[in-house]
Every structure is written in C-alpha cells, then in structure tokens.
C-alpha cells in the first residue's frame, strides 16, 4: 500500500484494513471506526480514536461496512490511526454522504417535541393543499 491517505470508493465493500465501519451493536453503536486488523473470518480489530470507539475486537455481524477506505498499515497503533483518519478527511466524507444525512434526519425526527410534530403535520397539510390546487389548475 502507498503511504498516502486517500479516501476512495470501492465497487465492492470488502473487509480490508483501512475500511471504515459503522458500529451497529454495543456501547459504541452509531459511531464510526476503522478496521485495523483482520482476526479471522468473522472478527476484526477496530479502532475509532476520533469518534470515541475504543480499540476492540468486533464481530462482523455487529458492524456495517461503509464505502469509505483509507490507507492504513496492518496493526497500526491508535495514534497512527488518528493521524491517518484526520489526514484522509474521513469525518468530512462521512458527513457529506447520504447515509449520514439519513441517519441525522432520523435522529432529528425522533427528537421532535409534541408541538414540533404538530407543526410538521400542519406544513404537510399546507403542502398537500398546494399540490392538489396546482394539479387541479393544470
């Protein structure tokens, strides 16, 4: 591998060192981490120093592979992972992805208060009325 940190998209989401994963189970659920080492066919060593995920062994059933990868030597220490993560701009690439935006939107909707849900309902009614009016006019 080259020594450069390049974020690239792959056609196939392979389990590889440097692949960014989204943890879906456990105390770090919803956070990003990077694969540092492949232990066996069902477990990997992940580390997410920039996102608060401690270095740990993770079952591949408990993480989701993202399309993001960056150059990372096998078995890298946490400090190396942190440097490569920031130099590759992984957090920015993730924030710009539609997947991250969808998760943020889902969290925002779940956190709405009763009054905010009422406002959303009223806005949907107004939009529906405007569309119905435009269709009837055409």
Which sequence ranges carry the predicted segments?
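Ferredoxin-like alpha/beta domains used as RNA- or RNAP-binding modules
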Residues: 2-17, 36-138
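Residues located in well-ordered beta-strands
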Residues: 32-34
């Amino acid at each position: 591998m080259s020594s450069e940190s390049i974020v690239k998209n792959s056609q196939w989401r392979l389990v590889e060192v440097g692949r960014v994963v989204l943890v879906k189970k456990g105390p770090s659920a919803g956070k990003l981490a990077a694969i540092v080492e492949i232990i066996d066919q069902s477990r990997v060593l992940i580390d997410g120093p920039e996102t608060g995920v401690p270095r740990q062994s993770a079952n591949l059933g408990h993480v989701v592979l993202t399309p993001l990868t960056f150059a990372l030597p096998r078995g890298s220490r946490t400090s190396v992972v942190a440097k490569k993560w920031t130099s590759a701009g992984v957090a920015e690439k993730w924030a710009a992805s539609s997947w991250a935006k969808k998760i943020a939107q889902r969290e925002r909707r779940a956190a709405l208060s009763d009054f905010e849900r009422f406002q959303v309902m009223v806005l949907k009614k107004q939009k529906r009325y405007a569309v119905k009016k435009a269709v009837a006019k055409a």
